[in-house]
Amino acid sequence: GLAERMEFRLCDGLSGIAPAEADTIAIAGMGGETIAAILAAAPWVREQGCLLLLQPMSAQSALRPWLQRQGYRIEREHLSREGDTLYTALQVRAGFMEALTPAEQWAGRQSRETADPLRLEYLTRLEARAARAVTGLRRSTRASDVPRLEALEAVHRGLAKMREEWITWQP
């Protein structure tokens, strides 16, 4: 069975795995920054073209552009639900990926060919989160918050456009 073909190790990141020992690596249940740090400490993962199955619990908007800058491409994203929580899983390999828009950094890329029944709910939730952040920053009187506000407004507009686009693509 599957248990004979898999090996599990407890180690700091990928430090306990030699480069030739793995062709597929799953990193799940931690934040996007932690996932990026684990991959940054193991450049052999990209060099060997390992398949990565990543499930960031937070900071997806930091992980996606980090992957792009480091020479990875996101081949596929899949949404799943447990209770009221939506989770994103990324299938990633070494390779070129076009730069992501600010909204795509939050939500991932979408295309007409993507069939995901949770996508509309996901986009709606992200758009609402961005709107709340924009509202909060608009209350700020600190000049240092202006660039963050402008960036979040761009994210919010992009997410709204992605949601509208997604709706028009549905049968």
Model segments located where?
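Core SAM-dependent methyltransferase catalytic element
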Residues: 85-109
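C-terminal substrate-binding/active-site "lid" region of AdoMet-derived donor-dependent transferases
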Residues: 40-93
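Short, glycine- and charge-enriched coil/turn segments that flank and shape catalytic ligand pockets
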Residues: 19-20, 46-48, 97-100, 140-147
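An accessory alpha-helical subdomain
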Residues: 102-171
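Active-site segment flanking the S-adenosylmethionine/decSAM binding pocket
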Residues: 15-43
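S-adenosyl-L-methionine
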Residues: 1-23
